[in-house]
Amino acid sequence: MTSWADIQKLASDLQRVQLTQSSKKLSEVNCIEVLQKLIASQQIDVVYTRDGHTYVTKKHLETEIKNECVAAGGRAPLTDIAVALNIDFDHIERTARLIVSSDDEFTLSNAELFATGYSLCRTKISISVNTCIASATNFALFSMNKSLLIEKLSSTDFEGVVDGDTIYTSSFLDARQLVLRAVLVALTKVTPISTIQKRVGLTPKRFWIAFENLQALGEVPGTLIGSRTSPACSYRPKMYDYLVKTCVTNQYRQNEFLQMSTLKTLGLDSKTALEEVLGASEVKKLVNLNSIYMSKELMEQCVQTVQGEARNITLNTDYIVFVPDDIQNSGIAEIRMSLQTLNLPLDTADEDLIGEKIASTEKDTNFSDGFVYNNSILTEALKSINTQIEAKAHQEVEKIDVEKKKQCGSKAPAKVQEDTDDWGDNKKGGKGGKKGGKGGKNGGGGGKGATSSVPTGSGTVQVNSEELEEWLRESQTVPEEILTVVVETLHQDATSALRKQVQEIQALQLVVNAANSKKSLSAIGDKCRQLYDSFNTFEAGTTSFADPLGTDLRQYLLKTVGVDLACAILSYAIGIDNVHQLKEKQRDETIESLPEMVREPIRALFASLKSTDEDAVEKFHDAVYDCSVPSATSLSLRKIDKKGRAEVGVKVSADLCDQLASQSDPATTLLLSVLYLFSQAGRPTTASGKFVAQLIAQMKDFCPTNTFELLQSCQKGVVTCIKNQDDDVAKEILSEDIEKLKSAVLQ
């Protein structure tokens, strides 16, 4: 490598050349070019200055950098050296690193170069730092110039402890530890660690170090509550436990009770903690109420106080005038008022527990809503309202009867006339005629029956609370203080008494109605036999007509007399003659409620009425027979013989004659005339207006000619008047013909 001497020699040679003849001189450009070639050929190793007018070898650069560091007092920033030497910072930094690696007398730190002579300055810094620490006891490193390299100071340079960014003296830490000990000894209650730490003035790390040092020395008179890292961590001194135990023990011995709120404040809200203070045996003797612990002796005193108050107290003076002596002394006491003399901090729940204990231990005693009272008050109160209960029972029985009648007596809506030819079908003459006039839908398709919400039995009646309260207030047998309580207590008993009274009244009514029921069943049975006889008679009459008229008449017979007979049999089965008033749904529900031996035959009976088969009448007779057997209704309905039918025919003729004589409606008069003439001819039947034209056609053989002609004329006139209701002339002609027909038939 080129030495500095070689450079100097080269410089001398160049200078001599420059001093020679001008022809041999080198320009500045030539000089730079020569140097560049020398550097490129690695003949020389130099570094240019920033302005390019000066160059220096790297070895000489190291010397100049060292000189600059020593000249600066042993410490020089690299930036300052670069400015002083007018060389790029990169060359300065690279050369400084070479110096540090090859020379132990120099150190590079944080872009600053330090010389060995700088140690004298470090000693001065140590003295300065010790002085600061001694005066301020602690200060943050950021307040010091970090260029002092305080981290490299040895423990012999100054007496202190570095904790993060803070330096503490040993004397300061010892003093803070003594302060912590004094605070821990002085505390008498549970205190948060954060409060103690703030009072001592240490960081969390130094605080716990001091705390652990005291613990190791046995100088911590207490325990920690919770985790050290938790903000809720607290210190519980032993003195606090002693004071709590003394306080609770003395309070319990003096008062014989302990408030749970006080125990919770003292940290004794658990049974285990309380046992540690009083002892497990003593805690077992305590009576646990809602907000207080008390001794069994104090509990007995409370019970005896209330019992004595209940025995000695008289009722409110407003009632003494009205209440009998045995009620005045029967016993009533308010828990709160009775226990005021004991001056106990009881809440409502505690008073209720005491009242319940009294009610459970003392015979014939009740407790409710803060009052203790004797059962005799309830007994006398219930007796005092017997009159009101009896009156209400009669009212309820009447309501039940009315509702039963409504449910069973709901009439189906009026039947609309089926067609214009079905006229005059309200009265048909005779037993069968009247029944036939009801039409084929009498027992059938009604609408949905309404369901009533009114009670239908004694099990649903009850006494309202407002009503009971009014009765008791009127009787003046219950003090106003416990009136609400007595109403709640007696509500069920009063309702039971009312239902019992209703049952007794209903039982009496059943006894009274029993005889009437037998008579009613007998009448219904006679009605069934009479209807079945009429049915057989009319059925025999329909056999004289050719089909399809005969078949139509038999179907009509089923829809009229057959339906009436079925309803009568069902009425006999249930014992109430009101089935004809029921709608179809109600009737079906009534059938379903019957016993199976009765239900099935009656169900088949009503089913046969809806049949349109040729053997519908035979099915009807079979069903009637099944309904009348002993296992069902015991009606014993039988088909009548020819003689019986003749007797029924005579009765039918007589009834038709009476109706015809009193009838004035043309259409009905015509129908009755036709039925009467057939009955007189030994062919009794029942029909509606739509059969009149066909029946008249069958009368030509046995009816006089003039009568037959009148029948035809009247039939045409009736149809004309129905179709033309405003034709007064036709009505007048019809009226004349009807009168002639009526006279001719009844003569």
UniProtKB/Swiss-Prot annotation:
One Gene Ontology MF term: UFM1 ligase activity
Task: Name the keywords, alphabetized.
Answer: Transferase, Ubl conjugation pathway
- Pfam families from the entry? E3_UFM1_ligase (PF09743), UFL1 (PF23659), UFL1_C (PF25041)
Per the entry, what this protein does is: E3 UFM1-protein ligase that mediates ufmylation of target proteins.
Compositional bias, Basic residues, is annotated for 429-438
- What organism does this protein naturally occur in? Caenorhabditis briggsae
Annotated GO CC locations? endoplasmic reticulum membrane
- Residue ranges for the region (Disordered) are 403-468
* Protein family membership: Belongs to the UFL1 family.
Q: Where are the compositionally biased (Gly residues) regions?
A: 439-449
Which chain regions cross the lipid bilayer?
A: none
Q: What is its EC number?
A: 2.3.2.-
Q: Where is the composition biased (Polar residues)?
A: 450-465
Output the InterPro entries linked to this UniProt entry. Answer: Ufl1 (IPR018611), Ufl1-like_C (IPR056761), Ufl1_dom (IPR056580), Ufl1_N (IPR056579)
Which terms does the UniProt entry file under GO BP?
negative regulation of NF-kappaB transcription factor activity; protein ufmylation; response to endoplasmic reticulum stress; reticulophagy
Designated name of the protein: E3 UFM1-protein ligase 1 homolog
